[in-house]
From Swiss-Prot:
Protein name: Probable glycine dehydrogenase (decarboxylating) subunit 1
GO molecular function, one term: glycine dehydrogenase (decarboxylating) activity
Paired cysteines (S-S): none
Keyword Transcription: no
Enzyme class per UniProt: oxidoreductase
Gene3D superfamilies xref list: Aspartate Aminotransferase, domain 1, Type I PLP-dependent aspartate aminotransferase-like (Major domain)
GO BP field: glycine decarboxylation via glycine cleavage system; nucleoside metabolic process
Gene transcribed to yield this protein: gcvPA
Organism, scientific name: Chlorobium phaeobacteroides (strain DSM 266 / SMG 266 / 2430)
Family stated for the protein in its record: Belongs to the GcvP family. N-terminal subunit subfamily.
Subunit note: The glycine cleavage system is composed of four proteins: P, T, L and H. In this organism, the P 'protein' is a heterodimer of two subunits.
Residue stretches in coiled coil: none
Length: 444
């Protein structure tokens, strides 16, 4: 909404209608001593052309994946976004509308969310999906709270290498709710050990969490982890990358009770870290504990199909202590991006994206491993992301490659670990991959 300043004449007319001589008469409750007595230190008045030039100048100091070749990953990935998505999402019915509190008035919005839910159920091989959570981290935290509520237990075990940011969000949720802290399983070769998990598991465990692929990009033994979790009556919670499911087994196929994920790779831009999209799916027997919004299909009195918000267990609708979650909204626009993305690609399309990402990442990993001084930190199978040990600090590699207009990856020293986390998507060409290897080999 544009800001159009009031003229002196506008101000006089408004004060006259209100029966006030000055603006100060409208704010008598604000003590005189804390009122601002001087003019704000603002830019001088500018024309539209001048404002546009100023903002473009400020924006030009930023860099983006449109201008640089990106190997950044660690939770946000540079996948191709078909231009049709923006065209459809930008329709005023979608872009400006917020689902009203009488939600059934917005049948188009509800149907779009319903289609998104249906796609997530198919992708994750689960029975029910909600309308989305804030992002992958909050979806995982809500999944753990749900597991605690369902089982009546308190302990939570992370079976493999979980994204550090997810760990922090999970810790915040659990501490605020007075629940037990998260226990980390031992790692070997970048993945969780089954012996370590078996030693940690007791009948006090509410949930066993695994990220697939994990933070390092490596593949965990999810089937064995799920069997161990269920052997002690714990719920098996999987945080699965949605693009990986074009190649890897879906969580529902290996026994996940709750499957969540970060939906950013599904047609959503990296956008400096958000807004993103939390995917949340469950098996049928847990549907009444699912948090967030849930859109269902029904029949109206004329027998026509209609869409409604169903099982409304949010604190907006019932007593707070009875609510399944205090998240009272959803990422509808981001979910729409994901639904359109998957609809445009189709089943074979998401397989192609996953295959290209995997093949190109393995090609790059093999080439980097042949550079003197560079090596792969882990030998475990991976999907599109891997950790490289470098002959110099990872931050130096990143700094040097920026001069070549390349985002070389994520510096793991941020998380008190050594290595460079490199991610490859279907966007990368062989020429770009070969150039990256050449530049790495030339570093001194």
């Amino acid at each position: 909404m544009p800001f159009i300043v009031n003229t002196d004449q506008d101000t006089r007319e408004m004060l006259s209608v209100l029966g006030a001589a000055s603006f100060d008469e409208l704010i008598p409750d604000i003590p005189e001593e804390i009122r601002l007595k001087k003019a704000l230190d603002l830019f001088p008045a500018m024309s539209e052309q001048e404002v546009k030039r100023l903002l473009e100048g400020l924006a030009s100091s930023n860099t983006s994946t449109s201008d640089y070749v990106s190997y950044l990953g660690g939770g946000a990935y540079d996948h191709f976004i078909p231009s049709a998505i923006k065209t459809i999402v930008s329709r005023s019915e979608f872009y400006t509308a917020y689902t009203p509190y009488q939600a059934e008035v917005s049948q188009g919005t509800l149907q779009a969310i319903y289609e998104y839910q249906s796609l997530m159920c198919r992708l994750y091989d689960m029975d029910v999906a909600n309308a989305s959570m804030y992002d992958g981290a909050t979806a995982l935290a809500e999944a753990v709270l749900m597991a605690i509520s369902v089982t009546g237990r308190q302990e939570v075990i992370v079976a493999g290498k979980l994204h550090p940011h997810y760990c922090e969000v999970l810790k915040t949720y659990l501490e605020a709710g007075g629940h037990s802290a998260v226990v980390q399983n031992t790692l070997e070769n970048g993945v969780g050990t089954l012996d370590g998990l078996g030693a940690l598991l007791t009948d006090r465990c509410a949930a066993v969490i695994v990220q697939q692929p994990n933070f390092y990009g490596s593949l965990e033994d999810v089937e064995a982890i799920g069997e161990l979790a269920h052997s002690k009556g714990a719920l098996f919670v999987v945080s699965a990358d949605p693009v990986s499911l074009g190649l890897l087994a879906a969580p529902g196929s290996y026994g996940a009770d709750i499957a969540v994920g970060e939906g950013q790779p599904l047609g959503n831009a990296q956008s400096f870290g958000g807004p993103y999209l939390g995917i949340f799916t469950v098996k049928q027997d847990l549907v009444r504990k699912i948090p967030g919004r849930l859109v269902g299909m029904t029949k109206d009195r004329n027998g026509d199909d209609g869409f409604i918000l169903t099982l409304q267990t949010r604190e907006q609708h019932i007593r707070r202590e009875k609510a399944t979650s205090n998240i009272c909204t959803n990422q509808a626009l981001n979910a729409l991006h994901a639904a359109i993305y998957l609809s445009l690609l189709g089943k074979q399309g998401i397989i192609d994206v996953a295959e290209q990402s995997a093949l190109k990442s393995h090609y790059l990993a093999e080439q980097i491993a042949d550079i003197p001084g560079f090596s792969l930190k882990y030998s475990a199978p991976f999907f599109r992301e891997f950790v490289v040990e470098t002959p110099m600090a990872a931050r130096e590699v990143i700094s040097n490659l920026l001069e070549k207009k390349i985002f070389a990856g994520c510096d793991l020293s941020v998380y008190d670990e050594a290595g460079l986390l490199v991610a490859v998507t279907e966007k990368r060409t062989k020429a770009e991959l070969d150039a990256f290897v050449e530049y790495l080999g030339a570093l001194k």
